[in-house]
């Protein structure tokens, strides 16, 4: 499918903004040091003659307004004198691209993440522009539909912070008058001070943070495919009920994660490696409400961190209800309180002190997750579909591409009453084909 770039420009804040540098926490330094690519798909809701549908002028005017409170995103990724990454609030602006395609929205299929989807619909930074923190592309399709591709640097914002920005931008765009009450009320003032996640002095590490230990990976990255596996409300309810066995009903998260973990072990054939073979499940957690006091609403930065559960493969694939597997998932997340998060921040500070180059050397690195392991990220509870720019809410929102085999996203459908949850999976092609079969077969049990 061909996409033609029509125009590229930089959009800056509509008012003067402070020029200073923002310190980044260790959680900021340990996310992927790249842009997170997402796509929002909108179907035309008005008449074909509506020339104002997704007007670039309206979008850019609103973007200029939202960059006033969110001015760090108009800056650039830089380094301090010691080489530690930081955000330089230069006000240089964000990239805004308009494009068009002779294809239709339906030609995109089910919008499963892929490198092609990212290449077509999300702007990419070349080496010279790698420090740009936010980039957007609006692609107009022959059918009248539109795709907004967003690329926000992960060092600058995690998923919730990025959604706060896009949703506030959309709310301002809905106020076509430009400066009325709706726009003023829409602005969620971001919290810019990241020192709330600074380590204690002296550090006090009270937990084992194995998720941040350097483990031997599986060598080079394997080729992988991605797929979206939808789960209906009825399937979710059946899984939660059957998985509990004689105990209490499982939560959606623990039931689905346990189900995915078991199916992945079976699809990958891990059980044949021997009963003592181990598998580790990584999960991404949010520190915002786990801290006491909680982080301020609108925290602009990364508050996400890793948690994990480890088990023998034989225990995961054992016949019977999912309850035992779900218990492992629940146990791994139950302990993630204020004390745990503070211990993690201190652990990372100690790791940085011991690293070559200090904090400047603290980064996620090129570690490759072993094929025995799984990494699940849940987008449940996030405001994924609130980006209404004045022409309706998105019909679809999701990742444009995934990074590695074994990565799984749990993405809720729009709150239209159907209660659907999409399981988005990246896995080597052979295992993925088996995973699809096992995934739905297990739901019938």
Swiss-Prot record:
Hydroxycinnamoyl transferase that catalyzes the transfer of an acyl from p-coumaryol-CoA to putrescine, to produce coumaroyl putrescine. It comes from Oryza sativa subsp. japonica. Expressed in leaves. It holds the Pfam family Transferase. Belongs to the plant acyltransferase family. It is an enzyme of class 2 (transferase). The active site is at 154 (proton acceptor), 388 (proton acceptor). InterPro entries: CAT-like_dom_sf, Plant_Fungal_Acyltransferase. This is Putrescine hydroxycinnamoyltransferase 1. Its EC number is 2.3.1.-. Keywords: Acyltransferase, Transferase. The keyword Transferase applies. One of its GO terms (molecular function) is hydroxycinnamoyltransferase activity.
């Amino acid at each position: 499918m061909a996409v033609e770039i029509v125009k590229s420009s930089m959009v800056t804040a509509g008012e003067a903004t402070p020029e200073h540098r923002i310190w980044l926490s260790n959680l900021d330094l340990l996310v992927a040091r790249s842009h997170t690519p997402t796509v929002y798909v909108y179907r035309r809701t008005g008449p074909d003659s509506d020339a104002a549908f997704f007007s670039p002028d309206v979008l850019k005017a609103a973007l200029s307004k939202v960059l006033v409170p969110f001015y760090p995103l108009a800056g650039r990724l830089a380094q301090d004198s010691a080489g530690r990454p930081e955000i330089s609030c230069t006000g240089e602006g964000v990239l805004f691209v308009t494009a068009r395609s002779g294809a239709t929205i339906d030609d995109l299929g089910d919008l499963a993440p892929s490198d092609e989807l990212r290449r077509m619909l999300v702007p990419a930074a070349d080496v010279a522009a790698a420090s740009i923190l936010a980039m957007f592309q609006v692609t107009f399709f022959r059918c009248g539909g539109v795709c907004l591709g967003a690329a926000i640097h992960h060092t600058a914002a995690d998923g919730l912070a990025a959604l706060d920005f896009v949703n506030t931008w959309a709310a301002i765009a809905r106020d076509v008058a430009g400066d009325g009450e709706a726009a003023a009320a829409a602005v969620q003032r971001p919290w810019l001070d990241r020192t709330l996640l600074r380590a204690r002095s002296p550090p006090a590490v009270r937990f084992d943070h194995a998720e941040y230990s350097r483990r031997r990976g599986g060598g080079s990255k394997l080729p992988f495919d991605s797929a979206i596996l939808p789960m209906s409300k009825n399937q979710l309810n059946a899984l939660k009920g059957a998985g509990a066995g004689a105990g209490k009903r499982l939560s959606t998260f623990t039931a689905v994660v346990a189900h995915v973990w078991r199916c992945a072990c079976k699809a990958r054939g891990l059980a044949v490696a021997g009963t003592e073979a181990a598998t580790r499940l990584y999960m991404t957690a949010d520190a915002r409400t786990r801290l006491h006091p909680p982080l301020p609403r609108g925290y602009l930065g990364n508050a996400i961190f890793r948690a994990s559960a480890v088990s023998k493969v034989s225990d995961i694939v054992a016949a019977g209800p999912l309850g035992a597997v779900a218990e492992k998932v629940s146990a791994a997340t139950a302990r993630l309180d204020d004390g745990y998060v503070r211990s993690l921040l201190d652990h990372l500070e100690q790791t940085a002190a011991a690293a070559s180059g200090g904090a400047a050397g603290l980064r996620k690195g090129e570690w490759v997750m072993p094929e025995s392991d799984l990494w699940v990220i849940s987008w449940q509870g996030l405001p994924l579909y609130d980006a209404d720019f004045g022409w309706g809410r998105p019909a679809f929102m999701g990742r444009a591409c995934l990074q590695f085999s074994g990565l799984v996203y749990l993405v809720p459908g729009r709150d239209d009453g159907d209660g659907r949850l999409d399981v988005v999976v990246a896995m080597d092609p052979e295992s993925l084909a088996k995973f699809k079969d096992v995934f739905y077969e297990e739901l019938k049990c």
